[in-house]
Amino acid sequence: MPTALPAWQSLSQHAQAIRATHMRDWFAAPDAEQRVHAFTVEAAGLTLDYAKNRITPETLALLLQLADEAGVLTLRDAMLRGERINNTEHRSVLHAALRGHAEDDYRANGAAVMPDVLRVRAQMRDFAQRVHSGTWTGHAGQRITDVVNIGIGGSDLGPRMVCRALAHLAVPQVRVHFVSNVDGTDLAETLAGLNPDTTLAIVCSKTFTTLETMANAHSMRRWFIEHGVPEAQLKQHFVAVSTNRDAVVAFGIDPDNMFTFWDWVGGRFSLWSAVGLSIVLAIGPEQFETMLDGARAMDRHFASAAPRENMPLILGLLSVWYRGFFGAASACTVPYCAPLELLTDFMQQLEMESNGKSVQRNGAAIGTDTGPIVWGTAGTNGQHAYFQLIHQGSQIVPVDFITTLEPVRSLPGHHTKLLANCFAQGEALLRGRTAEEVRADGITDAALVPHMVFEGNRPSNTILMQRLDAASLGALIACAEHRTFVQGAVWNINSFDQWGVELGKKLAKPILEELEGAPASVAHDASTAALIRRAKAAR
């Protein structure tokens, strides 16, 4: 139990000792610049400034002691060796191998995995080149102009986020679209205006049984046929990303057009695998492999950097600090970079599906809060929506600001205004605004002054990239993955299963049968039974 560790007990006492200290005092001290220097880390093209946190050098030392006592780096090494650290599913956790090079010695169950990884990567590269060159055509001999990725969860969020983030690097030959929701509106609106003769579908499902994905895949199959694509030629319009060859063949997809991956790849960590085929088609193999290299650089940093200089380790420990010792139930991710607007959606799955657990690896209760709610939007939009709560609300919400020093699209004056707002929000959260400062600004109405006071002392990190390119994005995502791992390792939970999503899927099956007219096969609670009756009556 993490709360029984000596470092946890020391941190609990330390948190009480510094709770009343305002960060303004630390930044007013003569050694403020030294604080910034000490609490800044660089890795793989990213710069992390974590000086605006409610920590001292002693805090950092205790957090690193906690990591040591919890065996975080020992578990890290076990993961990278291919040991089965996903103990509930008896699987290795080797997403780092997906961005590896031939000389990297990643192993699962003792067997080298890089030959298979490189084989599938080459298959993806070859396929993308065939599509981009027009060698791969639809049934009528026309080149592919549009690609629709059908998937959900890890088969959608990561690739969708990357394709949006790197849209400025997109190849001109194809447009990539994403469909995830079983609500038919999602697919219908995506297909509206597309030409079936020049459209390719990627059906992305590890098991090829995912309800939402297969419903959309079958509907798209009907769309092709209804628009004149001969059934025998559907193979020119479908490829699969899956591990279930029999189901792929039964659907009608040529097994030669199946891209596989492995059970040591978790869905939310899979965009680097064949699940990223849509990314390769969107930005080209060269940019995709540059993204892999950026992630690999972060992997190497995480594996070898000293603890005090280890960016993912520090970020993960800060998350534990606020969740466990300040009661921060949520954490906000705000990229001041419009192309990263889907990053928070990706981060929600990455962190909340990984660490939304209440039992330890051995099944015992954890004894502390875990898995904060992750939320946010792109800046500056968030400033005009929810920043009021972050600044003056009754709870602490740690914020991660993410931005680039160079603009993605250059319009005169825009990027400097963006950066000014990003930096100002972090400063405002730190400093706050005292009653004296409010009055000094000319506010004479005594009743109004309390409403204009900002407590400040609200923590934030700032992550800087020189520019948003494939390498920096790869490093940013890999950093987030490893940060998530660190949190789970401290809490002693398995961050690589997701049993919490299974029960709802199981219960949906008999309800679906009832909605389609079958008699009830299971007993429901009164509320659910009433909802089913209403839905059936409305049909």
Swiss-Prot record:
Task: List the SUPFAM superfamilies.
Answer: SIS domain
A molecular-function term among this protein's GO annotations = carbohydrate derivative binding
Q: Where in or outside the cell is it found? A: Cytoplasm
What highest taxon heads this organism's lineage?
Bacteria
- PROSITE patterns with a match to the protein in the record: P_GLUCOSE_ISOMERASE_1 (PS00765), P_GLUCOSE_ISOMERASE_2 (PS00174), P_GLUCOSE_ISOMERASE_3 (PS51463)
Record's catalysed reaction(s): alpha-D-glucose 6-phosphate = beta-D-fructose 6-phosphate
Which keywords, in A-to-Z order, does the entry hold?
Cytoplasm, Gluconeogenesis, Glycolysis, Isomerase
EC no.? Answer: 5.3.1.9
One GO cellular component, as annotated: cytosol
Enzymatic class: isomerase
Q: What biological processes does GO assign it? A: gluconeogenesis; glucose 6-phosphate metabolic process; glycolytic process
Q: In which pathway does it act?
A: Carbohydrate biosynthesis; gluconeogenesis; Carbohydrate degradation; glycolysis; D-glyceraldehyde 3-phosphate and glycerone phosphate from D-glucose: step 2/4
Per the annotation, which location comes first and is thus the protein's main one? cytoplasm
Record carries keyword RNA-binding: no
The cross-references to InterPro entries, in alphabetical order and at most eight, read:
G6P_Isomerase, G6P_Isomerase_C, Phosphoglucose_isomerase_CS, SIS_dom_sf, SIS_PGI_1, SIS_PGI_2
Which catalytic residues are annotated? E353, H384, K505
The record's section on PANTHER family has: GLUCOSE-6-PHOSPHATE ISOMERASE
State the family named in the UniProt similarity comment for this chain. Belongs to the GPI family.
UniProt function note: Catalyzes the reversible isomerization of glucose-6-phosphate to fructose-6-phosphate.
Identification of the protein by name = Glucose-6-phosphate isomerase
Q: Which organism is it from?
A: Ralstonia nicotianae (strain ATCC BAA-1114 / GMI1000) (Ralstonia solanacearum)
